[in-house]
Amino acid sequence: MVGDTIAAVATPPGEGGIGIVRVSGPGARDVLKAVFRPRYGRGVDDWASHTLHLGTIIHPDDHRVIDEALVAWMVAPRTFTTEDVVEFHCHGGSVPVRETLGAVLRAGARLAEPGEFTRRAFLGGRLDLAQAEAIIEVIRAKTRDGLGAAVSQLEGQLSRRIRKVRDDLLALLAHLEAMIDFPEEDLPDIGSERICTDLMQIQRQIGDMLERSRTGRVLREGWRTVIVGRPNVGKSSLMNALLDEQRAIVTEIPGTTRDAIEEYIDLGGIPLRIVDTAGIRETEDVVERIGVEKTREYLEKADLALVVLDGSDSLTAEDETLLLSLAGRPAVVLVNKSDLAVRRLDEKRLRSLVGEMPIISVSAKEGWGLKELTELIRRMVYGDDGLGYAPDGGRLALVTQARHREALERSYAHLRQALDAVAHGASPDFLTIDLKAAWEALGEITGDTVGEDILDKIFSSFCIGK
């Protein structure tokens, strides 16, 4: 609970350069005095805030020396948690870190719950809830663009957009409630047309965030991408080229890949959850047939299909069936083996089969065409404008989390109901019900209107030292 002093290891387990034990709370100074002996200068009570000190860590019971360490001392409220904070920077072995934590707990701190340091930062007003959640997104970012989106949220880009929409809603709500509560006052009636205009403008802002949430989901979870094609067209070679390592087995024997091989790759800043699948063909081999069925299952769930064809061979019935089955779905046709002099594939026939589907000539063996593929996928994820930037030069706010998306969807739905109410001549009383619900749903994102159960669920996903 807030008010006591907590401690936890803040670095990953195992050996490393340093191991950090973090302490936060009103008793942090007492813990520090009980377990640390400075090598030089004044005692702990005379230390300035945000200073480093060399000394030894001792056990408070028998005063045995545990380790030589640097201590960082930070005084409230200018700390991450807004409380007094001390960090013990020990040698990075499991034993000195464990012994230091044990000494700290013995001196009066208790072991922190998962995410409790960040929760205290939220409760202390250091961060709002969206910013607090961004910390775990920074840690788990899979690519440069994913990191950029997380840092943008941590810096408050999303929170500022949400608060702007909430302020607009609140201004409209306040005017309507004043008209209801003080009918005797000579307040201007803004009229149903003005109300509709304001509501649609607010709804557009929410709709824009929802539209960009697809990109946010891709950066957070990865774009589910499946490499498909008949056997021996170069699917595994393509995956190895994208991974830049020999991950899949490449042979001249059709049917070598019998099970799906899944990897995360960073393709120009976009995280792809890429799957190399068994070649699609009719086969009597039971194991290979299971692999083909799995390929079809992956294809049904995919965000993108990379269809690999052999440019040195004619289109087969299997190729054509596969291409026709992908009509209307996000897919890119990759004509492989473009490094070979022999080219038998009928390009006019191919174009007639795929319509507007992009076609790129590649050589998985030589790496040709991969840059063009990367640029195409970036456009498919981001659009022609890329990630985009806000007026202040920072990245535009992206909605990356399902919780935020669901809250925006609820707010959007309440605004739609409010617009319907205005269109049907409903009284301001009915209108304010949906406006309040929309305002509260948005507040769940920043933590202004959120219950303890939601906070428990969010912070329990953090690691103990965060």
Curated annotation (Swiss-Prot):
Keyword terms of this UniProt record: Cytoplasm, GTP-binding, Hydrolase, Magnesium, Metal-binding, Nucleotide-binding, Potassium, tRNA processing
Binding site for Mg(2+): 236, 257
Cofactor: K(+)
Family annotation (SUPFAM superfamilies): P-loop containing nucleoside triphosphate hydrolases (SSF52540), TrmE connector domain (SSF116878)
GO molecular function: GTP binding; GTPase activity; metal ion binding
Recorded family membership: Belongs to the TRAFAC class TrmE-Era-EngA-EngB-Septin-like GTPase superfamily. TrmE GTPase family.
Name under which the protein is recorded: tRNA modification GTPase MnmE
Binding partners and assembly: Homodimer. Heterotetramer of two MnmE and two MnmG subunits.
